[in-house]
Amino acid sequence: MVHNGIIENFQELKNELQAEGRRFDSDTDTEVVAQLLTAHLERGATPEQAMGKAMARLRGAFALVALFSGRDDLLIGARRGSSLAVGYGDGDGTMYIGTDALALAPFTKRVTYLEDDDWVVIDHAGARIFNGDQEVKREIRLSGISGAMMGKGNHRHFMLKEIYEQPAVVGDTLQSYVDPATRTVRLPALPFDWNKVSRLTITACGTACFAGMVAKYWFEKLARLPVEVEVASEFRYREPPLPEGGVCIAISQSGETVDTLAALRYAKAQDQTIVSVVNVPESAIARESDVVLPTLAGPEIGVASTKAFTTQLTVLLAAAMDAGRARGVLSAAESARLANALLELPGQINAALNLEAQYRLISEDVLAPARDVLYLGRGSSFPIALEGALKLKEISYIHAEGYAAGEMKHGPIALIDEFVPVVVVAPTDALFDKTASNFEQVKARGGKLVLLSDSAGNARLASQAVAAIVLPKVDPVVAPILYTVPVQLLAYHTAVAKGTDVDQPRNLAKSVTVE
C-alpha cells in the first residue's frame, strides 16, 4: 500500500476492525486502509470490489495505490482530493501510476488524470477507471514535460538551477503575453468584461499568495480595480460573501494545492468567474477554471519555489495591464512603456544573477551566523520582503520575518540589536524616502543592515549598511520581479553555508495536496 494524504475517519474504522479481532502493527491511517481492504477480501470480495467498498467508507483527502498478494499483474489506485495520474507506455503495454505528469515524466508523456472519487484498475489488459460502481472514460493527455528537463545540469542543487533559469523562463512567458513588435499585452480570450468586474479576489497559499499580494498593488494602481488577497486555507472556511460579477484568480505552481482548489470551488459556487495562474495546464485547478493563464516555468523540482514565482508575477502584471487598458485607466503609451520594461527584465535578471559572489559573502558573513533575520519593504516590495523571509526560513531553518517597513515602529523595532540582520528591499521608487527613513531608524538602534537597491539608493544608504547590493535600475512597477532574485540567492547561499538540505527541506513537500 502506498498512500498520500489523510484518512479523517481512520480511528472510527480502526475501532470497527479491532472489534472484529484484527490486530494492528502501527498507528498509521495507511494501515487502516490496508486492513479494510483485507477484511473485504476475506469476506469474498474481489480486489476490485474491495476497493469500491473501501472508497465508500473512507473520508478525507488522499491518493492511494494497492498491490495485492498473489496478483502481481494487478494495481488498483484511488483518489479523493489529492492528485493521482495514470501513465501509458509507448506501445509496449507498460502502465504507470503516480501523483502527476511530473512524477511520470521519466517514463511517459501520455497521462490520464483521475477525477475525485475515481479508482483505477491496472492489469495486463490496460487501465479501467471507475467512479463509484460505474466505469468511466477519462481523456489521455500528452504532457509537455520530459524526463530530460528534470536534471540538475551543472548546478549543485535543483534550486540553484531553477534560479538561473529565470531569465529564460521569464522570457518564454513574456513571449506568450507580450507582443514585442507592438509592445502590447495579449491574453487568452476572457469570458468576462474587465469593465463589469466589481471586485477581484485572489486566492493562493505560501509563495503564490505573495505573488497575489504584489498583483493587488498592480491591479489597483494600473486598473483601479478593487482586489482582495485571500490565504486559501482561511478563505475556504471563512466563506465570505462575494460580489455579483466578481472574478477569482487562483494561483498555484502545481495546480493541485488542496486549499487553493477548495477555495476555487467555493468561489465558483458563488458564481465567480475563475481564472487560474498555474504551471501545470493539465492540473485539477486548471481543469476547473473558466480560463487558464499558464506560466511557462517548466518543471520546478526544488521544494522552495523560485522560477514559478517570477513567472507568476510576470503573468499577473500582464493581466493587470490588460485590465488597465480595458478599463481606460492605462493609456496606450503607458502600456507600451510598461511592456518595454517587462521585455527588458530577462537581461536585468541576468545582471542580478552575475552578482552571485556578493550574495554568497553576505550569506556566509551576515545571515548564516544569525538566529533571527528581518526583511523590510514598502509598497509592492513588502510582499518581496515576505517572500525573502519565507525562503530563508524554508531552507536554512533560520527564523525570519518580513514586515512592511512602516510597521517597524509598531512593534518589530523592539527586536533590533547588533545580532539581528535586517534586509531592506528598497528600489528608488515613490516610497524610497520613506523606506530610507526606516533604514536610518534601524541603523540608529545598532541594527545590521543589508541593502538591496539600485545605484541611486546605494549612493544614499550603502554607507550605513554592513553589506549592499547594487541592482539594475528598473521601472518601479516591474521592480518586484527583479528584486526577487537577490532574496532567493541570499536564502540559497545561507542554506548552503549551514549545510541544510536545500532541495528537500525538512517537513516540507513540493505540492501540498492534503490539509
Roles of regions detected by a PLM:
Residues 1-152, 156-157, 161, 165-198, ...:
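Conserved short alpha-helical segments that host acidic/polar catalytic motifs at enzyme active sites
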Residues 6-8, 12, 69-72, 82-84, ...:
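Short, glycine-/Ser/Thr-/acidic-enriched flexible segments
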Residues 31, 62-65, 74-76, 83-85, ...:
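Structural motif
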Residues 84-90, 94-113, 233-268, 407-441, ...:
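Glycine-rich, anion-gripping cofactor-binding loops and their flanking helix/strand elements
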Residues 134, 159, 448, 461, ...:
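Generic C-terminus detector
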Residues 166-170, 174-201, 291-421, 495-515:
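Active-site phosphate/pyrophosphate-binding segments
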Residues 195-344, 425-467, 490, 498:
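Glycine-rich phosphate-binding loops that contact phosphosugars or nucleotide phosphates
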